[in-house]
Regions:
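Compact, glycine/acidic-enriched structural inserts
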Residues: 142-165
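Short polybasic amphipathic segments
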Residues: 131-137
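Short acidic/polar mixed-charge low-complexity motifs
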Residues: 116-119, 141
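A surface-exposed partner-binding patch
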Residues: 1-116, 181-183
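Short, solvent-exposed loop/turn segments that connect beta-strands within catalytic domains
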Residues: 61, 127-131
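Short, surface-exposed beta-strand/loop micro-motifs that present aromatic residues
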Residues: 119-126
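Acidic surface patches and DE-rich sequence motifs
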Residues: 114, 126, 137-138
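Acidic, carboxylate-rich catalytic segments that either coordinate divalent cations
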Residues: 161-169, 173-182
Length: 183
């Protein structure tokens, strides 16, 4: 799915996106964020897919954003052992070395969450952020998708992608809500 197609699904912005100093944020992160993510939140506020999957805009306060990322990652750091269970599209499990966590080089970086507490992450293993895979985890099992956020969400909505960590019936609709968070 291309960004233009995604915009047609979501419709016009209902709220102004948060003003984000992308250069400052990326400088402080030490990472260039994926283009589709920047496009998404230059156009929209936070998004929620089928009242379940939240995709969060960066906070305009960069220090606060870095704290939010760290807070989101802390439970995963505590749960991860030396190995983690990586599952395939059929739910088959293989034990693999645990993923590093941001700010470790190539670490997992948070971009969203579900109502069940699952985390949506990038694996920042490549210098080219356009090649970062998406990792979905419930804290115990991890699942990998090789593609960007727009293609991931588009694939979920048309049921071309089934994430085995998400409920089987998700999504039950193609509803995408926009919401702003009060500062």
């Amino acid at each position: 799915m291309e960004f233009v197609e995604f915009e047609q699904l979501v419709g016009p912005a209902e709220y102004a996106p948060s003003p984000v100093d992308w250069n400052l944020l990326e400088s402080r992160l030490g990472l260039r964020l994926p283009r589709d993510y920047r496009q998404l939140f230059q156009r929209y506020p936070n998004l929620q897919i089928d009242k379940f999957l939240g995709i969060f805009a960066p906070n305009s306060d960069v220090d606060e954003q870095l704290r939010l990322i760290d807070d989101a990652m802390e439970p995963l750091r505590e749960l991860a052992g030396v190995q983690v269970a990586l599952i395939d599209d059929n739910g088959e499990e293989a034990m693999v070395p645990r993923f590093p966590f941001y700010p470790e080089p190539g670490g997992l970086l948070d971009w969203g969450a579900t109502e069940n507490g699952d985390r949506c992450l990038w694996l920042t293993e490549n210098e080219d952020s356009e090649k970062w895979p998406i990792i979905i985890t419930d804290g115990i099992q991890y699942w990998r998708y090789d593609g960007n956020i727009i293609s991931f969400v588009g694939g979920l909505l048309d049921r071309a992608i089934i994430c085995p960590i998400f409920p089987r019936r998700f999504p039950s609709s193609s509803r995408i809500d926009q919401f702003a968070v009060e500062a």
